[in-house]
């Protein structure tokens, strides 16, 4: 239950111009959920967006896209989730209708649904993400770990796509959080 009507959120107004502002807590549609943010991570995309902008996002826009939290409101048509569930929420969901989705390349989807604005106290999760890319956490997983599930899944996907096996010799050019997650995931 939410006992107030407003929240704080981060908004990127321009390169290197991020501001905290107050806004109404979003109202959800029947197929959406509202999640109280527990942990929101900062990834390379966030840093690049902050430093030089991002072609798909024109300022001002809500900031952040990877997080975990607790469901505080569930839309009337949502199945499989309830108020109080601890969840990890990925940042996109494919349309499942375009050429790329039909050919197993969902990451290239022409109509991805994005979840932006996770640098906020409460996050409204769009229906396609609720249906495809939101997961109830096991009791043994904390929110810090859960907030890294999306980038970790990118690392695992990369390993699978490259068909890397234990004992293979590979060369990696570059370094960053995804590379670190690839290293700890060892096939």
Can you say where each PLM-predicted feature lies in the sequence?
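Short structural boundary motif marking the start of a folded domain
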Residues: 3-10
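Residues that mark the start of a beta-strand
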Residues: 8, 32-34, 169
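Short Gly/Pro-enriched turn/cap motifs at secondary-structure boundaries
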Residues: 13, 24-25, 58-64, 111-117, ...
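Glycine-rich beta-strand-centered segment in the early N-terminal region that forms part
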Residues: 26-40, 53-99, 136-140
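Cytochrome P450 core scaffold surrounding the K-helix E-X-X-R motif
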Residues: 45-47
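NAD(P)H dinucleotide-binding glycine-rich loop of Rossmann-like/cofactor-binding domains
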Residues: 95-173
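Residue-level detector of conserved catalytic or cofactor/ligand-binding positions
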Residues: 180-187
């Amino acid at each position: 239950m939410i006992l107030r009507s407003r929240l704080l959120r981060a908004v990127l107004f321009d390169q290197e111009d991020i501001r905290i502002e107050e806004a109404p807590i979003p109202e959800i549609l029947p197929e959406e959920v509202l999640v109280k943010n527990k942990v929101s991570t900062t990834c390379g995309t966030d840093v690049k967006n902050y430093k030089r902008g991002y072609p798909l996002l024109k300022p001002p826009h809500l900031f952040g896209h990877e997080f975990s939290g607790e469901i505080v409101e569930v839309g009337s048509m949502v199945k499989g989730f309830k108020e109080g569930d601890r969840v990890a929420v990925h940042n996109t969901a494919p349309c499942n209708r375009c050429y790329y989705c039909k050919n197993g390349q969902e990451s290239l989807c022409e109509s991805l649904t994005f979840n932006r604005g996770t640098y906020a106290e409460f996050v409204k999760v769009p229906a396609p993400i609720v249906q495809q890319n939101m997961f109830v956490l096991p009791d043994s997983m904390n929110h810090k770990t859960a907030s890294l599930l999306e980038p970790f899944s990118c690392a695992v996907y990369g390993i699978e796509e490259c068909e890397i096996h234990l004992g293979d010799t590979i060369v990696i050019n570059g370094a960053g959080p995804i590379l670190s997650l690839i290293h700890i995931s060892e096939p």
